[in-house]
Amino acid sequence: MNLQEMNARKEKIRNFSIIAHIDHGKSTLADRILEQTETVSKREMQAQLLDSMDLERERGITIKLNAIELNYKAKDGETYIFHLIDTPGHVDFTYEVSRSLAACEGAILVVDAAQGIEAQTLANVYLALDNDLEILPVINKIDLPAADPEMVRQEIEDVIGLDASEAILASAKAGIGIEEILEQIVEKVPAPQGEVDAPLKALIFDSVYDAYRGVILQIRVIDGSLKVGDRIQLMSNGKEFDVTEVGIFTPKAVSRDFLMAGDVGYVAASIKTVADTRVGDTVTLASNPATEALKGYKEMNPMVFAGIYPIESNKFNDLREALEKLQLNDASLRFEPETSQALGFGFRCGFLGLLHMDVIQERLEREFGIDLIMTAPSVVYHINTTDGETLEVANPSEFPDPTRIENIEEPFVKAQIMVPNDFVGPVMELAQRKRGIFLTMDYLDANRVNIIYNIPLSEIVFDFFDKLKSSTKGYASFDYEISDYRPSNLVKMDILLNAEKVDALSFIVHKDFAFERGKVIVEKLKKLIPRQQFEVPIQATIGNKIVARSDIKALRKNVLAKCYGGDISRKRKLLEKQKAGKKRMKAIGSVEVPQEAFLSVLSMDEE
């Protein structure tokens, strides 16, 4: 293909993604677009075709982004090449969204005709605007009885400030308005910029590990072109590889002769190690390298940390391999080895948020068959010591001696909560209970409010989202971003079982709530830990001070069963003997802590 043909082809390319809040019909719309452009035959079609992970289908959420090439014959008789990049909509996967948007020129904004704009929609729209994307509003689900497209149109104009007079009314489920959406993509989304004859620059926006071909990179080519046999260089570390295959996804991988500026596809170059390929890195040709890298993604910092331990200690290496493979597709997962006296060897992992943590845990158990124990999630605290040092600590067991601590700072988030009017009371009550600091409250329209709070991340980490959903009957939508670190009156609480500290049960708590929390947890553990042959005291302590205690009574055999009547001194002798035995047992006995006990530390305020 000569330069002229390449440029002509580039003019026909449209790269776009679909952004929406959870459940506004994004994956269904993607399915319809695939059907309409006949990318997928009716026979192969199944619901949520792009959500290829079992987990994604079960939970009905999109976790990983997907990129697909479609051909569309427009009304003007020309055939256009569409690249649809599917994105997740959940708070924790904002990073995945920012990666997909960096590879696009336009975005379809899907808003539910019955629900209107939600917090997460807003967050994603701002990401799209930051990337200078052309945004096409689509009002979806207009066939619902509760749909009110005109109200939503007004909302898009008022809240986001987009002109919604030409917003397309559609129903992805019934297939209404799909043709119009495709035509608008042709008209409004700009063709990719970029020079076909410039040195190669391509952005890695995802990577997948294939047991046979090594690491497969998903790339968006910005400048230049790439073919099999080229030697590529990664700009962040200068490593070079020979390209063995290039191609595109039409959900399935299809190999091609070359990829050129504007294309979205994949490259296999027998890259062995996961660590070599950073998402957000720039790929260029070793023979004719680009002078400067593309501006990459910002590094996402994990906000929530938890210990992951294999239940069978000989599975430690399997767990490491599994985490390395997951990290390959999941740029935001971090982990490092750690040991715990109670749980043996494991890893301290960093996640973007709770759903992310859940999904990783489930994938480890499901895809790699490893049984896990997870410890209570914690956040990163900044500890200023008396000798002027600042420590960053994510694991409660690494806290320094209380006498060395000058003060402790914890991360606060700026939380946006959108709720119907009727639920403002319960939401504010919940936020106050979680030590929230009220900032502002805006009325979006007659019946929806946007409330903004500063809340400590550690309070959100536990169960804030579930509590929010249950106190608003599921109507609230919630989005947060990290704002800053602030000093707080925090203490570390340890749990002692049979006078031995269980490091995996330690947690950080605000001093005002320490007493209640200690009481709740001690009672909870009492129910969960099975009775032993000897009495087990459970104590919650702060430093050397015991704040709560409860005892698990011993199981005992009735040693008097065989004394039919008889002398009291005989009975006393048997009882004393039993007592001495229990005492000896207690001195050397150790207590098994079941997995539920670790989780009970999490779901603290449920009673």
Swiss-Prot record:
It holds the Pfam family EFG_C. It comes from the Bacteria. This is Elongation factor 4. Keywords: Cell membrane, GTP-binding, Hydrolase, Membrane, Nucleotide-binding, Protein biosynthesis. One of its GO terms (molecular function) is GTPase activity. One of its GO terms (biological process) is positive regulation of translation. Required for accurate and efficient protein synthesis under certain stress conditions. May act as a fidelity factor of the translation reaction, by catalyzing a one-codon backward translocation of tRNAs on improperly translocated ribosomes. Back-translocation proceeds from a post-translocation (POST) complex to a pre-translocation (PRE) complex, thus giving elongation factor G a second chance to translocate the tRNAs correctly. Binds to ribosomes in a GTP-dependent manner. InterPro entries: EF-4 (IPR006297), EFG_II (IPR041095), EFG_III/V (IPR035647), EFG_V-like (IPR000640), EFTu-like_2 (IPR004161), G_TR_CS (IPR031157), LepA_C_sf (IPR038363), LepA_CTD (IPR013842). Belongs to the TRAFAC class translation factor GTPase superfamily. Classic translation factor GTPase family. LepA subfamily. GTP binds at residues 23-28, 140-143. NCBIfam families: lepA (TIGR01393), small_GTP (TIGR00231). It is a peripheral membrane protein.
